[in-house]
A protein has these predicted regions:
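Short, polar/charged alpha-helical segment
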Residues: 34-61, 67, 90-93, 150
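Short, well-ordered beta-strand elements
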Residues: 24-37, 55-61, 131-135, 161-163
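Beta->alpha turn/N-cap motifs
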Residues: 33-36, 63-65, 79-89, 94, ...
Length: 210
């Protein structure tokens, strides 16, 4: 498995600007995605991290990795768990002092874009997507995935009307009939699929966007 793919799966970013270690803190604050099932949640639920570190660990849920970056920049969060490579790269490119401290496996089928079923658009007629309105969280892994998929089908970002929206909000909007296409991950992605279909999945998607 390529490192680029595993980084896309889970980028843990450390707010190095705090200049402190965990043992010097009264409390460690960790950002995470509530609807993103990961093995660490067992230890989180059973407070095993608190026990190992000797201090309370406060877990704060976020809807997107970009929000995690903002929280770390303000000092409100010390570590972002499963932030995603795209938000990390965007933040560090802008000068934010973050450090990747661990990586995990790829999650190709748990991050995708969904087209409204009534449009009857699939991988064979993607030209019909031109001019459609898409809701996605800009600057995240879902955004990168969207760009990779439309590029594979010969489309450009300028072919769409894009609205910056978190997966949680876009899944709700999609269910109420808004938007032609939405992109997201985890629990919101499952809800999106109740009203639409993906263009690529499995090995085909892995080959295009990882």
């Amino acid at each position: 498995m390529k490192i680029t793919k595993t980084l896309t799966a889970m980028a843990v970013a450390l707010a190095a600007t705090t200049g402190t270690s965990a043992v010097a803190l009264d409390e460690l604050v960790v950002g995470y995605f509530m609807e993103w099932p990961t093995a660490n949640q067992y230890a989180q639920h059973n407070k095993l991290y608190d026990e190992a570190l000797g201090i309370p660990v406060k877990w704060v849920s976020f809807d997107a990795g970009t929000a995690m970056s903002a929280a770390m920049a303000s000092g409100d969060v010390h570590i972002s768990y499963s932030q995603g490579v795209t938000p990390f790269l965007v933040a560090t490119a802008a000068g934010q002092d973050l450090q990747v401290i661990d990586i995990a496996e790829t999650y190709s089928d748990n991050n995708n874009c969904v087209v409204r079923s009534s449009l009857e658009i699939d991988a064979d007629n993607t030209d019909e997507l031109k001019g459609k309105q898409v809701a996605l969280p800009i600057g995240t892994a879902a955004h990168s995935d969207f760009l990779a998929q439309i590029g594979h089908f010969g489309l450009a970002e300028s072919d769409f009307k894009i609205v910056d929206m978190t997966p949680v909000d876009s899944a709700a909007a999609f269910a109420s009939g808004e938007f032609d296409m939405v992109c997201g991950w985890g629990g919101p992605l499952r809800r999106m699929k109740e009203h639409g279909n993906v263009l690529l999945s499995g090995p085909a998607k892995e080959a295009v966007s990882g």
